[in-house]
């Protein structure tokens, strides 16, 4: 075998895992009467540039936004732009419907609150800014190590039996999301788990879908600490695996060298 190819394979094998962003194969798990939200997005996360009905992405525009950066600063690359699907009516002024106006105001309010609550994390991007004529639902492509948090929708209360978050992990070469331990029950229904009910802060005056996504500043600090702890643990485990692999290779090389030396000694004795 070519020694250069052997050296390349060896270096590839002992490279510490996690240096390259691995996309998660599936979406985060779904919980009945609950929605999930990412407080910050790891580098490598992609967001589809989706437009609402009657609009389409411009031909020269990128199909997605990408969270990229370095150890000191991360931001979203590319910009999503939507244009009217009807080329003939481009000069016609379209009056937005009341629902669209309400949705736009809600999105702007949500973006402002998120920018105020969020703290910059190394290797993470904030919530992507909204763009004109954006689709109602955002489609993300998360990477390994991403953490999302769950919250019951308006009209339901949370019964916690464990962590209410999910993390995308790499296990045996495959990605999987941990299962969040959250149960949402109607506010009028009796609790089946005494002592496990936890109150939820839901600002009045916001639609159900938007209210369920908001995260308070206090919750964000706690979640940030949990996220940092989990990421440190994941990195430490992967690093230990890499070190163990290096030690194994070193021992193998030493054993092979020893066996080769013994064979040479035996041949020399026979020759003598």
UniProtKB/Swiss-Prot annotation:
Pfam families per UniProt: Sushi
UniProt xrefs under SMART domains: CCP (SM00032)
CDD domains hit by this protein: CCP (cd00033)
Membrane topology: Single-pass type I membrane protein
UniProt signal peptide: 1-21
InterPro entries from the UniProt entry: IL-2_rcpt_alpha (IPR015486), Sushi/SCR/CCP_sf (IPR035976), Sushi_SCR_CCP_dom (IPR000436)
Domain Sushi, residue spans: 22-84, 123-186
Protein's name in the database: Interleukin-2 receptor subunit alpha
Organism field: Macaca mulatta
Gene: IL2RA
């Amino acid at each position: 075998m070519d020694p250069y190819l052997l050296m390349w394979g060896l270096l590839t094998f002992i490279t510490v895992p996690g240096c390259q962003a691995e996309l998660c194969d599936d979406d985060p798990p779904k919980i009945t009467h609950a929605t999930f939200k990412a407080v910050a997005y790891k580098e490598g996360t992609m967001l589809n540039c989706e437009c609402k009905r009657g609009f389409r992405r411009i031909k020269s525009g990128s199909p997605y936004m990408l969270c990229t950066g370095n150890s000191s600063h991360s931001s979203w690359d590319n910009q999503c732009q939507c244009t009217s699907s009807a080329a003939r009516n481009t000069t016609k002024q379209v009056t937005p419907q009341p629902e669209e106006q309400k949705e736009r105001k809600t999105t702007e309010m949500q973006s402002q609150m998120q920018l105020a609550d969020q703290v910059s994390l190394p290797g993470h991007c904030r919530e992507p800014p909204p763009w004109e004529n954006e689709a109602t639902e955002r489609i993300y492509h998360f990477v390994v190590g991403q953490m999302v948090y769950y919250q019951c929708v308006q009209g339901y209360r949370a019964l916690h039996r464990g962590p209410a978050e999910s993390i995308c992990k790499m296990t045996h070469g495959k990605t999987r999301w941990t299962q969040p331990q959250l149960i949402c029950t109607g506010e009028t229904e009796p609790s089946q788990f005494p002592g496990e009910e936890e109150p939820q802060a839901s600002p009045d005056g916001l639609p159900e879908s938007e209210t369920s996504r908001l995260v308070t500043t206090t919750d964000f600090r706690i979640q940030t600490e949990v996220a940092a702890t989990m990421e440190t643990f994941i990195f430490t485990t992967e690093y230990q695996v890499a070190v163990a692999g290096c030690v194994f290779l070193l021992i193998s090389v030493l054993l092979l060298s020893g066996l080769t030396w013994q064979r040479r000694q035996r041949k020399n004795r026979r020759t003598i």
